[in-house]
Amino acid sequence: MTSPQAPQPTTIDRLAQHVGREVELSGWLANRRSSGKIHFLLVRDGTGTVQAVMSRGDVPAEAFEAADHLPQESSLTLAGTVRADPRAPGGVEVTVRSLCVVHQAEPYPITPKEHGVEFLMDHRHLWIRSRRQHAILRVRAEVIRAMTDYLDGHGYLRVDAPILTPAAVEGTTTLFATAYFDLGPAYLTQSGQLYNEAAAMAFGRVYCFGPTFRAEKSKTRRHLTEFWMLEPEAAFLDLDGYMALAEDFVASVVGRVLERCRVELRALGRDPAPLERVAAPFPRISYDEALRLLAERGKVVAWGDDLGGDEETVISAAFDRPVFVHRYPARCKAFYMQPDPARPEVVLGADLLAPEGYGEI
């Protein structure tokens, strides 16, 4: 006589492969409701969410009683049979045969009511368990994978620039300073560009990707004190070559997210149509042409002034995909930008402006 086979440990994203079989799941209780003789447990494990149905007659009495009082976010392990159900997320649910409470959680502070950002940031370690934050972080992870895969596949070498630096790259007014032993101040990096440029002279094509810090006090969606930035650098790449690389890179990353993150984009309420239009070639206009476009729309900018967020929004609204603005005046760009030999008052550089008012990429 053979002993019954033990339930197979699996994850929620793989349940559709186990319809009709006994499985074991470990996760956290996202929600719970009861109709007296049946508990409906919404369980998540990081890969997805599934409804687990527990009937009084199918499980030991103590397990059924324990489930009746489980607080949200309690951790548990359950075993049961996977059943096909087209109405359920993922097309399956689990009929529970046994339940083990690993840990009973404290009362969960994030309730269905509206909470302020300050409250949610104070509980950030719990907030990331929510459906929306979960989707944001999954999309972010896919963007990072897509970016590094693209550059690795095009012969770029990743180099890691220091986070503590001796000098400013983007101006001294936005530096975070710290004492560096008895050697004077050091600064949190604003950019790895200067290190990248040195590395490009050794390897030809390089990129760095890491945290960046700007001591900007403005509280807008365009200003962050800390963010992660990817910076490629290539030797012997002219302005047209740079723009061709940038548009192919951006289109590739957006296409990858559309391919692999449809579920997350739906969870975020993101209309995919504007993303589907992000395809090369991107429009290219000069700084002078940008000023004329702005003037036609009632925004007059003096020649030589940099373009701000409002101007970038107006320009990007004129196109249905990212747009390059190239050949800015030298006086409004960084010292390391190369002057145009045919017109030394402008530089051989370009900004890529995203549609929908997001501004410079």
Predicted regions and their residues:
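Class II aminoacyl-tRNA synthetase-like tRNA-binding/catalytic domains
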Residues: 2-235
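Extended, non-catalytic structural segments that build the interaction scaffolds
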Residues: 135-139, 273-279
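Generic non-transmembrane alpha-helical segments
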Residues: 146-154, 249-260
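Cytochrome P450 heme-thiolate monooxygenase catalytic core
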Residues: 158-160, 265-266, 325
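Acidic/polar loop patches that form or flank catalytic/metal-binding clefts of enzymes
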Residues: 159, 258-259, 300-303
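A translation/RNA-centric and nucleic-acid-associated enzymatic feature enriched
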Residues: 170, 174-252, 270, 277-361
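Flexible, glycine/charged-enriched surface loops at secondary-structure junctions
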Residues: 259-268
